[in-house]
Amino acid sequence: MGYGDALDFSGLTVLVVGGSSGMGNGIGQAFRECGATVHIWGTRAGAEDYAGVEGSDLSGLGYSQVDVADPSAVAAAMVPFEQLDVVVLSQGTVLYGRGEFQTEGFARVVNVNLTSLMTCAMRVRAMLAPARGSLLIISSTGAFRSTKGNPAYAASKAGTLGLIRTLAEAWATDGIRVNGIAPGLIDTKMTEVSTKHPERLRRMLDEIPLDRLGKPEDVAGAALFLASPLASYIIGQTLVVDGGSLLS
């Protein structure tokens, strides 16, 4: 391996689940910029439905609508490649207003944030194995601490850590490397409920040693590293990308 070429993904295929906006979209575009052919699974009917949506840039990316909360939809989902070199599972949801304290809301969040990860992972396993590919699962720093108003979010993200470790061990014999990323407070549409309030934002920044919000590009950099030959001897790990917030 030449280190200068380690982030060249030319000729490789990448699927980003939940890549229509936010962190997932940033990851998809980063792989495209590094030469990969990238396909996105999202929730809207077509790529054109994301035109003008904040944090969404599907230019140069393939797209399919897939409801990852529905196992039958995942089983039938189109993947336009014979094999996959990298799969990123970045789907996620959260409910505010104490919605996760209701049984229905709790189940909905866990289904998307945890159960669908296993559903999607099983769907792509046979396509990753021939390429000895990389599976990346996006968790959260919420896996390591209480998220007071969001019990389902915290529980599902903590469960993701166990899933990453277990799949990494189970699939290592297939040559599939499984790792995760735990982002902290990233400036996306999903976090606007907090970041649009100056006083609340200031309190949050006071807990981040780097004194800034993360950007989707910060998470994308971690994804490129973990999927590259630079990380060829790393499995079952979850890389924290949080500006140091877990240190305080």
Residues covered by each model-derived region:
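Short, small/polar-rich loop/turn modules that mediate ligand/substrate recognition or access, typified
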Residues: 172, 177, 234-236
